[in-house]
């Protein structure tokens, strides 16, 4: 299950990237922010989408995951 703080509940556009792969949704592993799906256009000013370094308690190490959050939130 994807933690809510990664933005899984925020609507996003699922688009194909220039490399032919689909963008990655919140919680997916990533290597750069350009891989991550962006919030729907109506929310693009309110929300930011990026590849973020997160602690994985299950794996016991840091991993890079796509994240979408409200830019006015202290969690962003």
UniProtKB/Swiss-Prot annotation:
Secreted found in the keyword field: yes
Record-annotated disulphide pairs: 23-37, 30-51, 36-66, 69-76
Major place of residence: secreted
Keywords tagged on the record: Disulfide bond, Ion channel impairing toxin, Knottin, Neurotoxin, Secreted, Toxin
GO cellular component, one term: extracellular region
Physiological role: Neurotoxin with probable ion channel impairing activity. Is both paralytic and lethal, when injected into lepidopteran larvae.
Similarity comment text for this entry: Belongs to the neurotoxin 21 family.
Stated name of the protein: U1-cyrtautoxin-As1b
Species the sequence originates in: Apomastus schlingeri (Trap-door spider)
